[in-house]
Design a protein with these regions (language model features):
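Conserved alpha/beta-domain cores
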Residues: 1-186, 190-209, 215-217, 229
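Gly/Pro- and small hydrophobic-enriched strand-loop and loop-to-helix capping segments
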Residues: 219-236
Length: 236
C-alpha cells in the first residue's frame, strides 16, 4: 500500500534530524545551531501545515504565484523566498517574506530597495553566489562578492544577512565539499571586512542530496524539499 504524503514526511523528518545532528557534531556544533528550511514547492498546504505542527519553523517557496496562492493557508511559520526572483515580482512579496535568499544581481537589489522604501520596511536578503562559476546559473561571481556586498549594503531599505549558494549538480555529494568550503571561506572573509549594513549571520547552502556535507563545511541553514516530502508532483 502506497504511503501517504504525511507518512513519508514523518519518516523522512526523523531521519533528517538525526543526520543534521550528526553533521553538526562533526563541525563542532549542535543540532540547534542549524536551521532546517522546508522547501515547499508543489507541496500541498495540508502537508505543509502538518510539517509545521511537527516542528518545522521555516518554509521556503520558489515561485511567487504559488507562494501567494498558499500564503493565507499557512499555520504560523517563518516564510522565506528561495527561488529566482524577477524584478517585476518583487512588489508582490517584499512585505510577505522575512528573507529573500536569491538576490543575484545589483539590479534586483535596487528594486528590492525601491519597493522596501515605498513600504517603509527593511528587506532582509542573502546574496546568491555562483560558486561553481556555471554559465547556466545566476548569482554573483565569487571574486566580486566582497565588492558587491559593499555596493549593495549602501542601498537603503535593505539588510544583508548572509550568503546563499547552489553548487554544481554532482553524482556524489562529496564532490561538492570543495564548493561548500569555498563558500565558508568567503562568508568569513566578508564578515572580517565589517561592512556597514551587512552581517554574515546566515550561510544558506545544502539541499536534499548534499545537506550533510554542507553542514560539515559550515552551513547553518539547509533547504530541503525532496528529502523531506518525497519526489515532487508537478501539478501546480
Amino acid at each position: 500500500m502506497e504511503k501517504s504524503s504525511i507518512e513519508i514526511f514523518d519518516e523522512n523528518y526523523k531521519i533528517i534530524k538525526e543526520n543534521i545532528a550528526c553533521a553538526a557534531k562533526k563541525s563542532g556544533r549542535k543540532f540547534e545551531d542549524i536551521t532546517l528550511l522546508a522547501a515547499t514547492k508543489t507541496v500541498d498546504i495540508s502537508v505543509i501545515n502538518h510539517a509545521i505542527s511537527s516542528g518545522i519553523s521555516y518554509i521556503g517557496e520558489n515561485r511567487v504565484q504559488e507562494f501567494l496562492s498558499k500564503e493565507d493557508g499557512f499555520l504560523p511559520v517563518h516564510k522565506h523566498f528561495i527561488g529566482h526572483l524577477q524584478t517585476n515580482k518583487v512588489k508582490d512579496i517584499i512585505d510577505r517574506v522575512e528573507l529573500i535568499h536569491s538576490v543575484d544581481s545589483y539590479r534586483l537589489a535596487q528594486e528590492i530597495s525601491r519597493q522596501a522604501l515605498k513600504r517603509g520596511i527593511t528587506a532582509n536578503i542573502l546574496l546568491e553566489i555562483n560558486v561553481g562559476e556555471e554559465q547556466s546559473k545566476s548569482g554573483f561571481c565569487y571574486d566580486e562578492a566582497i565588492q558587491m556586498t559593499r555596493e549593495i549594503a549602501k542601498l537603503d531599505g535593505i539588510k544583508i544577512k548572509g550568503l546563499m549558494a547552489i553548487p554544481p549538480i554532482c553524482e556524489n555529494s562529496e564532490q561538492n565539499r570543495p564548493y561548500f568550503a569555498k563558500m565558508k571561506k568567503l562568508f568569513i572573509d566578508i564578515d572580517t571586512e565589517k561592512i556597514d549594513n551587512s552581517s554574515m549571520d546566515i550561510l544558506s547552502m545544502g539541499m536534499s542530496d548534499d545537506y550533510a556535507v554542507a553542514i560539515e563545511e559550515g552551513a547553518n541553514m539547509v533547504r530541503l524539499g525532496t528529502a523531506l516530502f518525497g519526489r515532487r508532483k508537478y501539478n501546480i
